[in-house]
Amino acid sequence: MALKSKVIRPRDFKYRGYTLEELQKMPLEELAKLLPARERRKIKRGFTEQEEKLLRKLRKKGTARTHCRDMVVLPEMVGKVVFVHNGKEFVRVEIKPEMIGHRLGEFALTRRFEKHSGPGVGATRSSKYVPLK
């Protein structure tokens, strides 16, 4: 008996039951009702000058550099490239539909993962006997 292989197709993106096209046509106030409380409050209070400037640049060019790590990812930003500052450099972030409702800073990590290796020469008395490479 031959086994049938399943074809796995990528599912269409939906955010709380709405497709990306529906979200892009939706007014900002209506979109805010779908977002979590913190992001909803941020949109309700309005955007800062830098955030407005970022949105204008994205509409015009499609890419922008920014320090606005608090900016909420909106449906109109999907497909654009944003360079977000992480404290040292600008990290390239390509906006995908799954990022809607999150903050830009979540995708530009400020701390680097540091993997410490074994003890070095002269670390402690007990590490003298650890064979060196």
UniProtKB/Swiss-Prot annotation:
Highest taxon, organism lineage: Archaea
Keywords assigned: Ribonucleoprotein, Ribosomal protein, RNA-binding, rRNA-binding
Function: Protein S19 forms a complex with S13 that binds strongly to the 16S ribosomal RNA.
GO cellular component: cytosolic small ribosomal subunit
Gene Ontology BP annotations: ribosomal small subunit assembly; translation
Pfam family, one: Ribosomal_S19
Entry's family note: Belongs to the universal ribosomal protein uS19 family.
PANTHER family: RIBOSOMAL PROTEIN S19P FAMILY MEMBER, SMALL RIBOSOMAL SUBUNIT PROTEIN US19
Name recorded for this polypeptide: Small ribosomal subunit protein uS19
HAMAP family: Ribosomal_uS19
PROSITE patterns xrefs: RIBOSOMAL_S19
One Gene Ontology MF term: structural constituent of ribosome
Gene, per the UniProt record: rps19
